[in-house]
């Protein structure tokens, strides 16, 4: 599998949606999520020559370390930890079951990192439903599975609007955060959808 087009698509969608992500974060956070994610995406794109020569696992680790060093706020460690964990867990040619197991490891790593849990208005609320879908995929063919994953990610983002935040700056808002989707969840869904579109 050539991962370079997937990386290009995922990073470009974050750059293209910077204004949306900024607006989402201005509503319930400190307003810098979009700019931080764009900075990380641009830093990854600047390494495309290196990433294109690396294996999937090496590229995931490189991107994870890049996120940690370039993305400000909590998003750098969060997305960096997720990518580094996936680098350790994924085989070179992952199946849907492999992806589910790797996401499970990533969710556990993020829970240890930030003490967040599913249902607390974080990107875990996108990752976990997608993990469950992949784990139960069975004999779904590629096109149908990709469509379901994309829809699951989009639906899961919308569901965060009905959650009170348990972690991060938005947790101080309590019920005032209701009605607003989580910016990190939206970023995660954008990444997932862009990858599905290119597979």
Positions of predicted regions on the chain:
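N-terminal loops that bind phosphate or other acidic moieties
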Residues: 1-199
């Amino acid at each position: 599998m050539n991962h370079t087009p997937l990386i290009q698509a995922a990073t470009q969608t974050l750059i293209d949606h910077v204004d949306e992500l900024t607006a989402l974060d201005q509503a319930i956070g400190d307003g810098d999520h979009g700019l931080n994610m764009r900075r990380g995406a641009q830093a990854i794109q600047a390494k495309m020559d290196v990433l294109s020569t690396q294996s999937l696992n090496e590229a995931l680790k490189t991107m994870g370390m890049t996120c940690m060093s370039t993305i400000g706020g909590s998003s750098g460690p969060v997305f960096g930890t997720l990518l580094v964990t996936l680098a350790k867990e994924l085989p070179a040619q992952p199946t849907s079951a492999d992806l589910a197991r790797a996401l499970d490891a990533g969710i556990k790593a993020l829970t240890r990192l930030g003490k967040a849990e599913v249902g607390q208005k974080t990107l875990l609320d996108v990752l976990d439903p997608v993990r469950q879908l992949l784990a139960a995929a069975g004999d779904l063919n590629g096109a149908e599975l990709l469509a379901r994953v994309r829809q699951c990610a989009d639906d899961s983002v919308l569901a965060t609007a009905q959650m009170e935040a348990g972690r991060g700056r938005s947790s101080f808002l309590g019920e005032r955060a209701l009605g607003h989707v989580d910016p990190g969840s939206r970023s995660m869904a954008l990444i997932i959808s862009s990858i599905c579109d290119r597979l």
